């Protein structure tokens, strides 16, 4: 697990701020680094819902949020697999969905994000370049193929306006129109 870098984090903060985000879903809590960036861009009353399979990750993230002075009511930590948790979240309720979880599930995360997002909402995927493997057709491992297919699906989706940002390991961002 490698946390998002400062460039990617700054983009997440900017995106959350730009759309005055009140409700954000994060897939892959990690140690809370990307969650802190998102929270810093959200409205003061905004709530981050963050999902991770690892209890230790969520414990570390909770500690990071507390140390950063984030009010406990602004963060909802949900343990579990994203594809078990996301279907239980409210349709059309979220302003941003950020995915940095299991790369082989990115296409499924996209389907859930489209359901969860309000019109005008933003979906973002970290590691969209996957160590420069996505552009190399000879690379056929499961993660690379999944991320490559995600890029194609986002580009071709009629209700998404996408951009691939060459920040860190690539940040694929799309607005739901």
Give names to the regions the model predicted:
Residues 6-177:
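S-adenosylmethionine/decaboxylated-SAM
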